[in-house]
Amino acid sequence: MFFKALFLSLYLFFFISYAEIIFCIRIKRNNLYNFQNMTNSLNIKNLDDVKEKVKYEKHTYCLLLDKYKVNKILKNKRAKFWLLDIYKFPSVLKYKEYKNCFLQNDHNDKNNHMLNFIYNNYLKKRNHQNVKNESENGNYNNDHNDHQTCNNMNIFFSNEYLKSLSNFNEEDFRLIPLNDFFNKILLELFYKQREEIIHDDVIYSKNNIKSLSHVFNDNSPEQYRQKEKQQQVGNIIMCNSNSPEQYRQKEKQQQVDNIIMCDENLCETLIKDDEINENDDNKNPLENLCEDFKKDKDDIENIYNMHKLEYIEELFELIKEEDIKFQRVKLEFGYDNMNTSEILRKIFPCINEIIHKFEIIGHIAHLNFCDKLESCKKIIAEIILDKNKSIKTVINKKDILNNTHRTFNIELLAGENNYVTQLKENNIRVKLNYELIYWNSKLKKERDRIYNLVKDNSIIIDVFGGVGIFSLSLSKKSCLCFSNDINEHAYKYMNINISMNKNKNILTYNMDGREFLEKLFNLKIFSKNNNVLTLYINDQNQKNISLDVLNSKNHIITGNGKNKSKNKNENKNENKNENKNENKNENKNENKNENKNENKKDIQNNNMCEKENNISDRKCPYIHNNNNQRNITCDNNNNNNNMNVSGNNSIHQYTDMYEHKFKYQKIGEENMDNSKNEENHKIDINLNIYEDIHILMNLPQTALEFLNVFKKYKKEKNDELRNVFIHCYYFAKPEFFYEHAEKNILLHFNQLPKDIKITEIRKVSPSKLMYVVEFNLKDLL
């Protein structure tokens, strides 16, 4: 009975445990497979743990030479190819500091003998070629001492070498480390030169057998010497036989034996170093790391494959001429000798996605972490912040772009809480607040493509302009630019960027995209029949543009020439007017010189007018660039906009209306802010200078829905239209990208244009790509 109860209790226990496991798998799958304890498994909690984790050692050959001969190596481009190039590690080391890191050249060091063998055979070939050349020229000398003794040369540093030097001083010697390509060429040359010795009947005489034995005699292991003797005998027999097939088989077996006899430590070093070199990337580690590294590595590999023999001969020549020795040294590397990419690969070798999923915006590094990296994102952020001195802030995007202004919630991972940053793209300075404004550095290639596509003297209409980067770029091609964004913060920095870059051909607006396009339709800007464009602009656009620039074909020459002095005078006058307005409400003594001919009553009336202008600006929004209707006055009772004022009225008439309207209204404080005061400025632009129109609609989430606004454009009879090219960006699945664009165009226009061009911009996710559809609106109107 007892055993039965025990059996039932155990059965019940296992059944409940099994049920809990099934419940976790089905209901709590995310928590079960979320890699929450990844950093705990690595035992990394801070930067000190990271530094300890990434330490490694490297055994490498070094050139040991006098400090006065170092420049001959460094200035030789061919020899420089073989030098070690590790991030923030010196190319030249002091002998005194690294003498304790020397690896002893004992009698069993096969790597050293292999290098001796290659170097001496190189000298033998060179001497043999010199003798041959001398014999052809009739200057043959029977002295073969050099030829006989070259194989006995030891090119490695030793204590005996030190004793042979008079007045030895440690301060006078330097070490130059060699890279992994040097190790690689050693193996290749070793097998290649042995094959040449085996195949060449002339070289393989008795004297050459003896000279070859000198290379490995005494300094090589007993097993290797026995193996070498067997190979020599076998090779002599094969040279006298007429069985090439057996010779090839014997040769293959010999190569295998040589590989086995080769120092295993060297092979392991080569393999490990190749793995490390795959992480080498001296370029910016925060932008397309994997692709950039592959390109760099391929370039170096190509150089190696094409010029390795020339370069190694050049190095051996320098070694012979300058009496340079070799020494194997143990070098230690760590956190300071690795860039961001290498450190992340070392710590997280199985997670490639963290290497390339962040971008730089000025001093801000923006990362997109997946769930499985949630527990280690702080460590990664600290590494990025510490290894990149230009980065001050590291952030993570918490959610997707799901609002009108295309901004997202920011999670500060490391660094300063400062999101106002500056960056430079194609010599254009851009300032923005990354927390309040959308910016994507990955669209640089698309901006360059549009720049190359647009011709000079075009008209640019950027409906969703952001900080105005498209207009800032295309303004260099003497284009008339209209840049708009509904985000008031983007509008603010758009004007700041125009001022920073000293552009004088960009008009800026802060309106809804549909309303912005409708107002431009009323300007008849699409028509070739309209020769002069008359605009009424606000104070901000008055500062942004220059009529001399807009009415010239080459904006750059005009802007840098005569117009420069005019702009200075205009700016001086504007500054004087601004200073007057600011100082009117200050003490009488400060304004005495500026307002000598004005009486107190006029000053008071002017102040009343200006302050009421501020009130009117706050009460009723100003609609820019409307020829037919102007928002001039504001009704006190219902705050409705008055649209009945003609566009031909002068600025003085508007001022008189303001004075009459608010003459008797009480003034509050005398130092009221006048910064928002706006007046209408009439400008005329010669449209005959400009040709095609390009409408940029970079709002991929909803841009296709805005196409229906073009149906409101009414073409007049006998009206010849310009080419109006639409560049509409959108998201779509890769298998339906063309059908998606075609469907939306048909939906809004009931027909398709003659030519439709669709370009893939970038991959947002595996099932979501960004495209741009381009067509001529002229075909649909």
UniProtKB/Swiss-Prot annotation:
It catalyses: guanosine(37) in tRNA + S-adenosyl-L-methionine = N(1)-methylguanosine(37) in tRNA + S-adenosyl-L-homocysteine + H(+). Keywords: Cytoplasm, Methyltransferase, Mitochondrion, Nucleus, S-adenosyl-L-methionine, Transferase, tRNA processing. One of its GO terms (molecular function) is tRNA methyltransferase activity. One of its GO terms (cellular component) is cytoplasm. Belongs to the class I-like SAM-binding methyltransferase superfamily. TRM5/TYW2 family. Monomer. This is tRNA (guanine(37)-N(1))-methyltransferase. The lineage of its organism: Eukaryota, Sar, Alveolata, Apicomplexa, Aconoidasida.
